Amino acid sequence: MEAKEKQHLLDARPAIRSYTGSLWQEGAGWIPLPRPGLDLQAIELAAQSNHHCHAQKGPDSHCDPKKGKAQRQLYVASAICLLFMIGEVVGGYLAHSLAVMTDAAHLLTDFASMLISLFSLWMSSRPATKTMNFGWQRAEILGALVSVLSIWVVTGVLVYLAVERLISGDYEIDGGTMLITSGCAVAVNIIMGLTLHQSGHGHSHGTTNQQEENPSVRAAFIHVIGDFMQSMGVLVAAYILYFKPEYKYVDPICTFVFSILVLGTTLTILRDVILVLMEGTPKGVDFTAVRDLLLSVEGVEALHSLHIWALTVAQPVLSVHIAIAQNTDAQAVLKTASSRLQGKFHFHTVTIQIEDYSEDMKDCQACQGPSD
């Protein structure tokens, strides 16, 4: 297209024209329509790339169906947890059982952690602001961290009470009431576990199933596993005490053993939370594989400042500087690199800066990749 013809199109005021054969909508993440004062060359380059992150996500991108499912799971589980917690407090009081009462306290922690998770999910859905320009995505991660820490606090209290009972030996337990209450507790924990369980599909798209799991639901699920272990310990103790009342020391011993096991179940969640907060490379995204994929794009000579991190466990983000050879179409490189990254790794956001390649990049320490 000649320069004069371009200028004529820019100055023209009659009907709106589309240069790609489709209506481009301004305000919905699309390239604006040509009007006086706009750079037509920039419009043509943008049209050539045919790639825009917000347009891909669509207007309903903030209504994440996975997040909605997580909220429904937590609502149902928290309602079940609250109702049975009240019943277990009554049963523990009637049975004079510390194990049942501490199991009820564990349920209280489960309930509180689910409320924290629901609050964090609501916070993470709030739009970005000028101050919080990434949005509130990591409120979910902070909620999971608080849930894990609350497990540790309650577990410490349970261990302390179990040791205290072993030392004093001054307690009596109603084995029958304890047996009924603990049996119901096991059943309720199984129901809550099934409600919160997240099953992944059998094939992979470059991410692991753990990446697809909601961290708040995972934290709540671990809470339920811990409480299930505690309830099983109480059930075993109740069964023994029902037939052998003189073996009352079984109650604090079971509480002590199963409380220790709870701590181990929190380590995987804590590891994921720390990885996100420290902006480490997310699980399921291999740094070397990403680098090799970018270098395989035609025209790419080198790259530097490759950073891969995550807003949350399931939202990996990438930024990189790509150096291209002379006479290479920058928009073609940008389009190819972006589409390959999205196709293989499903990044939430990709930011690529195109630069001209120079020979001194080979010896520049700042341009070298990070160590293993």
UniProtKB/Swiss-Prot annotation:
Binding sites annotated in the UniProt record for Zn(2+) 1: H106, D110, H223, D227
GO MF: identical protein binding; metal ion binding; zinc ion transmembrane transporter activity; zinc:proton antiporter activity
Highest taxon, organism lineage: Eukaryota
Enzymatic reactions: Zn(2+)(in) + 2 H(+)(out) = Zn(2+)(out) + 2 H(+)(in)
A GO BP entry: zinc ion import into zymogen granule
InterPro entries: Cation_efflux, Cation_efflux_CTD_sf, Cation_efflux_TMD_sf, CDF/SLC30A
Transmembrane segment boundaries: 141-161, 176-196, 221-241, 250-270, 305-325
Membrane topology (Lumenal): 162-175, 242-249, 326-372
Residues reported in the UniProt entry to bind Zn(2+) 2: C53, H304, H321, E355
Cytoplasmic side: 1-140, 197-220, 271-304
Sequence motif Lysosomal targeting motif, residues: 294-295
Any one GO cellular component localisation term in the record: secretory vesicle
Family, per entry: Belongs to the cation diffusion facilitator (CDF) transporter (TC 2.A.4) family. SLC30A subfamily.
Disease implicated: Zinc deficiency, transient neonatal: A disorder occurring in breast-fed infants as a consequence of low milk zinc concentration in their nursing mothers, which cannot be corrected by maternal zinc supplementation. A large amount of zinc, an essential trace mineral, is required for normal growth particularly in infants, and breast milk normally contains adequate zinc to meet the requirement for infants up to 4 to 6 months of age. Zinc deficiency can lead to dermatitis, alopecia, decreased growth, and impaired immune function.
UniProt subunit comment: Homodimer. Interacts (via lysosomal targeting motif) with AP3D1; in AP-3-mediated transport to lysosomes. Interacts with TMEM163.
Protein name: Proton-coupled zinc antiporter SLC30A2
The organism of origin for this protein: Homo sapiens (Human)
